[in-house]
Amino acid sequence: MARFGQHGTIAGNEHAHRATREVFMGTLRDILATRHGIDITEQQEQILFDDLHAIMEINKTMNLTRILSEEDGMVLHLEDSVLGLPYVNDAPVGLYGDLGTGGGFPGIPLCVLTGRETLLVDSVKKKVRALEPVAEELGLGDRLSTYGGRIEDLALERPREFSVLTARALSSLGSLLELASPLLRKGGRLVCYKAQPTEEELEIAFGIMKPLGFELVCDDSHELSDGSTRRIFVFQKAANPRIALPRRVGMAQRNPLMPVDFAQKSGQKSKKRR
């Protein structure tokens, strides 16, 4: 499998890739099964390693990821990405989007394992364009596409089209809730991968989730095989947001919504009713 062209993916270093894959084949499956209770096939594992190798090769000429070795990538990209599989599978049937996909993680692995129609989203167009030939060579071209642009613009173009979204190391939970709300249909889910969110971040997110139309489905902690901790938060779209979304591009990060914003709006409405 896997022959790429001049951007220097798998074809440029096939011997090294085969050697690395021979060393690690089976290891990822064992880790996922024993540590996380997730089963994948040998063929799926091979596709995931081909994906990782392709991204590592592209990364030599384009900054897709800060992780520079396939050994580290097996844990910090593949194992980490696949942690989201049960949560994505629990979401309603339909379109899956990976927000801020970067090097295609967790989007490509979850496309491989779920079989869902998938959209990889990143504001840097050249990043998602670099992922397109990778997807083709992995046999995902019929169900995986890319969007190079801002999430707010995507929400205007494709409102309420998504059944499930993922976001890994992209922004604060509160900002992610705001960005995801206009994209998700009712009943859709947002799966957020976080390392160690602060109490302040959690307080803000939990304080604005209901006004944005969400309810918390789960907050799970996982330990990766390198000893690091990953928390996965899953929010379900239960209602329409109380405010018009999306706001202008960048507002979710530059001027994030706070619980007090909605308390003030409720107070203003109460005064008007009185």
Task: Report each predicted region and the residues it spans.
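Class I SAM-dependent transferase core
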Residues: 2-8, 13-97, 126-142
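Short loop/edge segments at beta-strand edges and connector loops
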Residues: 68, 147-149, 218-220
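Short "lid" loop at the C-terminus of a central beta-strand within the Rossmann-like core
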Residues: 172, 195-199, 223
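A short glycine-rich, Lys/Arg-flanked "PGG" loop and its adjoining helix->strand segment in the class I
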Residues: 175-189
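Conserved beta-strand signature within the Rossmann-like core of class I S-adenosyl-L-methionine
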Residues: 187-197
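SAM/dcSAM-binding transferase cores
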Residues: 205-274
